[in-house]
Amino acid sequence: MKKGKADPCNYLFRRARVIDPARDLDAVADVLVVDGILTDIKPNIDLPSDRLAHFAVIDASEKWIVPGLIDMHVHLREPGEEYKETIATGTMAAVAGGYTAVACMPNTKPVNDCAAVTEYILERAREQGHCRVLPVGAVSSGLEGRSLAEFGELKGSGAVAVTDDGRPVANSMLMRRALEYAKNFDLPVISHAEDPALSEGGLMNEGPTSTLLGLHGIPKAAEEVMVARDLALAELTGARLHIAHVSTAGAVRMIGEAKSRGVPVTAETAPHYFTLTDDRLMTFDTLYKVNPPIRGPADVEAIKRGLADGTIDAVATDHAPHSSIEKDTEFEYAANGIIGLESALPLILELVREKTLTPSQAVAKVSCNPARILGLPLGTLLLNQRACMTYLDPEFYFVLDCTTFRSKSRNCPFHGQPTRGRALMTFFNGKVAFSRLSK
């Protein structure tokens, strides 16, 4: 990188591969950022030498510039569990991973089921956040599954969706009412698809490995029964339904069939569901304990097919920080969850290297598709606006080392894994929020 007398946030990227699926753009181009404003994208940008002296000129050959990534499913733990993560540390982890927006789940303490908590989260994000924070409100008051939260109040204060994530809405009538109510406010309802009667006491995927280990399993039906119910309710109400963390082949099939009938449903999965299989638990390593559980090889392949054919719209991390005490204990008592903000990008790019996804498809899963699902004008490169983009090297080789993560927690099962693909710079709101480039 040629720095010279560059002014703050003046950058000229030369010969970058610019991928913006929302604009159907995938081309080699120069990219100009002037005073933090994304000013131009075209094959060759010539600046007079006296003006060029005020820019950092970066040879971006073989690198990508993409819209700032969006993770539509994270747990920032604030308020109430700041020993696991805070808005400050979680959003720093996000920009280190290439993300410029994160949607945070409502299972905080107190639960985000009212305007006061939503407003608190947004205020903390303004004060200490490093990227955009998108609060998701609760479906039910206190996540108790008894009565609906005030969706209008939640949306009015800044919530972008509603969910009881971390637990299902077990009462079918309440879920129906939630979909009908949310439709009035054009809010998607995010379903944590789990039948609690079928999953009760389960510690991992039900199958040969759970039998061998003597661990109580969670059958695929625990997810699929609830997916089927919620698809039926979405079809009945015409409301927008989003299925979170899809993990089974049966769920992929049902979602695909529902889409073909015109049901207004979208879906996400997480990197661990297309990367890991349940035999990883043979060592009883609690880093692999997550809900829904890591499944078998056939499910992994089905998830990949669902991503490729568009059945699964988005990849979200389900970033779920936990303290070492909560993970370093007997398997039965260990908390469920994996952090993912700083490990997701190389795992997603592996789908490109193995030709499951094209580069444009992969970028869409973490940019314009989540933005579309949440109904937000994000996930695209907007000219003459404050730069919100990610500069990445898809072939950057490194070993994932959770001891260097910006997240407060270390529960990452990919620690020590050699991998490729990393964010080099993350621009948010016209500023460099994170950079790995030398000064």
Swiss-Prot record:
Catalytic activity, reaction form: (S)-dihydroorotate + H2O = N-carbamoyl-L-aspartate + H(+)
Chain sites annotated for binding substrate: 75-77, 107, 291, 322
A biological-process GO annotation: 'de novo' UMP biosynthetic process
Domain of life assignment: Bacteria
UniProt xrefs under InterPro entries: Amidohydro-rel, DHOase, DHOase/Allantoinase_Hydrolase, Dihydroorotase_CS, Metal-dep_hydrolase_composite, Metal_Hydrolase
Binding sites annotated in the UniProt record for Zn(2+) 2: 165, 192, 245
A Gene Ontology term for the protein's cellular component: cytoplasm
Main enzyme class: hydrolase
Pathway named in the protein's UniProt entry: Pyrimidine metabolism; UMP biosynthesis via de novo pathway; (S)-dihydroorotate from bicarbonate: step 3/3
Cofactor: Zn(2+)
This protein's UniProt keywords: Hydrolase, Metal-binding, Pyrimidine biosynthesis, Zinc
EC number: 3.5.2.3
Keyword Ion transport tagged: no
Active site location: 318
Keyword match Hydrolase: yes
Details of cofactor binding: Binds 2 Zn(2+) ions per subunit.
Function: Catalyzes the reversible cyclization of carbamoyl aspartate to dihydroorotate.
Family: Belongs to the metallo-dependent hydrolases superfamily. DHOase family. Class I DHOase subfamily.
Matches recorded under NCBIfam families: pyrC_multi
Protein name: Dihydroorotase
Gene that encodes it: pyrC
